[in-house]
Amino acid sequence: MFSTSKKHGGRLLAAVGITALATTAAVVSVSASASGNAKQSWESPNSGPTPTVVLVHGAWADSSSWDQVVRLLQQDGYAVDVPPNPLRGLASDSAYLADYLHSVEGPIVLVGHSYGGAVITDAALGNTQVKALVYIDAFIPDEGQSVLELASAKPGSCLGGGGNPANVFNFVSFPGAPSGDYDLYAKIAPNSAYPGFADCLANDLPPSEGAVLGATQRPITLNALTEKSGPPAWKSVPSWSFIGTLDRVLPPAEQLVMSEHAGAHVTYGRASHLSMISDPEGVERVIERAADVAG
């Protein structure tokens, strides 16, 4: 991804890394179990109480990124919570979500998009109410891994910036920031090393919609991308993964590696990194599949 920049303390940024894997045109479901992390079959639906679906957004986004999925789930009778993700640091973001989950009654299906996948992985640990984890174009770290490390694991992300993070991100100081930490904003305009916000993150949405998403983005800190993940909840909680084959941010090949390592049930869909906006029906189907087991 990036080579290290002297100005920013030698730490690279690749908030979500990816190449387009132009494979399946239709949605294809595949169950995958990693060796050493194989889980029992979770195919038989439960008949218990309907779970609450908790949706966690990723970097450069807010809770509104889930709006279409929320409407579909509510129409199907699900209670849905969409708490804010502070985007301040993996440990603190996960602790914030873990505390929030204790306010939810009954079984939970916990869903994370992109960086939100790393957050749910840590936040759900030890919470017996969380019956299923769902990863949407998401990071699925194991203990000791960082988002930055996983983003760089496969080549081809549109966030690579030709090895210079300054081609992709604006580094902005903020009050009380630890030494070497910055708020990171994805640049909106393209340059020779970066296709611009809309074509990178939202390449299957109308350019005007991508422009709005870029203008309204929320920053994530550099530290959030470099902090190491703790013990993963997916070792004890069944998981599902939706991989957009048009994702230019987090390479589908790397998403598959992470999904298989976690023993997740994998579904491919023809969508960009923002599949919950461009293919909300496909995303909702995967969430409801998990909910059928979790209920």
Task: Please tell me what each predicted stretch does.
Residues 46-104:
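Active-site catalytic motif of lipid deacylating hydrolases and related acyltransferases
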Residues 25-47, 295:
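C-terminal region of N-terminal signal peptides and the immediate post-cleavage residues
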Residues 111-116, 120:
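Gly/Ala-rich beta-loop-alpha elbow adjacent to hydrolase catalytic centers
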Residues 129, 135-181, 221:
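Flexible "cap/lid" loop of the alpha/beta hydrolase fold
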Residues 264-295:
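Catalytic active-site module of serine/aspartate enzymes centered on a nucleophile-bearing elbow/loop
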Residues 1-34:
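Secretory targeting and sorting signals
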Residues 245-271, 290:
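Conserved loop-alpha-helix segment in the C-terminal half of the alpha/beta-hydrolase fold
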Residues 133, 238-247:
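Conserved strand-to-loop "acid loop" that flanks and positions the catalytic carboxylate
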